[in-house]
Amino acid sequence: MTSSRGLGDVYKRQAEARGGQRGPENVWGSAAVGAFLALLIGAGVEPRELMLVGFAASFAAKLADTFGSEIGKRFGRTTVLITSLRVVPPGTEGAISLEGTLASAAGSIAMTLVMLALQLVPSWPVAGLVMLVGLVATLAESLLGALVQDRVAWLSNELVNALQTLLAAVLAMLLMEL
């Protein structure tokens, strides 16, 4: 646990050295799954519609996470650990708030509506699935943060973000096949 805290301090110092701005590792952690699916779509891999749904879900989950984290930290009145509902300080790995969760839902909805408008999501029922998966993957990311992230030194925020978007894409694609 001490090593993960030390690693967290390293990442914090790196972010502070950049004036709090995100680095390339943040972009890859957030967009690698979507970028990979976009490459597959561009290469003509079939079924295209399934890949598009995975693409949309990965970005719906990412925007849900961003909205939930930022709004939850700033405006969350009561922050609780997702595993125990014990009150914890804002910003704690695995912490959620009502305000942050509602913001996560709004982020997933917003990105899905953009994908629907761009005709990357084929219908309203599929859009509903993408919206739901975006929120579920965000809550799963909080669960992963609460249960594992502080205990595993190499499990960075960027890797957790990549796992979240992967979960969203895979879950949406699997549910489309049902």
Where on the chain are the PLM-derived regions?
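Single conserved hydrophobic/aromatic residue that forms the stacking wall/gate
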Residues: M1-Y11
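Helix-coil boundary and interhelical linker segments in multi-pass alpha-helical membrane proteins
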Residues: A38-A56, L113-L129, L171-L178
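Glycine/small-residue-rich hydrophobic helix-like segments
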Residues: I109-R151
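Hydrophobic alpha-helical segments and helix pairs
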Residues: R13-F67
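Juxtamembrane helix-capping/reentrant segments at transmembrane boundaries
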Residues: K12-S30, S84-I96, A153-N161
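Short helical (or helix-break) motifs at transmembrane helix termini and adjacent helical loops
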Residues: A60-L81, L139-L143
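Core segments of transmembrane alpha-helices
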Residues: N26-A38, E99-L113, Q164-A169
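Interfacial loop-to-transmembrane junctions
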Residues: L144-L166
